[in-house]
Amino acid sequence: MSLRHMSRRASRFGVVAVASIGLAAAAQSVAFAAPAFSVSPASGLSDGQSVSVSVSGAAAGETYYIAQCAPVGGQDACNPATATSFTTDASGAASFSFVVRKSYAGSTPEGTPVGSVDCATDACNLGAGNSGLDLGHVALTFG
């Protein structure tokens, strides 16, 4: 599912869940440096832990969305309880905390319930972007 498609349906989800996109990043001009998206720590996590998210090289003053998701039954199952938006500063950077969950009731970006997600067995990730740019995805592992 493309990020552009997901953003059109964001009103039902509350924010765009950016799970397994990448088309927007692939379509970017080669003249622009790719943005950097990092999560620390990303492994050995525990339920309810706060992780530090850092973004650089993105567009200045843009709103992006971030969500914890996992592929479940061929669909993206995101956590609507923690999905949120953030805005980059004048240099295209942002730093903030995000609470990760080991398990949650997953929903598609359209808001359709998908079922339970258990990040101990499902391949969970934290992804960020908007309809014009995929900032990236970081795999999450729980200890």
UniProtKB/Swiss-Prot annotation:
Keyword DNA-binding: yes
InterPro entries registered for this protein in UniProt: Neocarzinostatin-like (IPR027273), Neocarzinostatin_fam (IPR002186)
Top-rank taxon, per record: Bacteria
Gene Ontology BP terms: defense response to bacterium
UniProt keyword list: Antibiotic, Antimicrobial, Disulfide bond, DNA-binding, Signal
Disulfide bonds listed in the record: C69-C78, C119-C124
Protein family: Belongs to the neocarzinostatin family.
Job description of the protein: Binds non-covalently to a chromophore which is the cytotoxic and mutagenic component of the antibiotic. The chromophore binds to DNA as a weak intercalator and causes single- and double-strand breaks.
Protein name: Actinoxanthin
UniProt organism field: Streptomyces globisporus
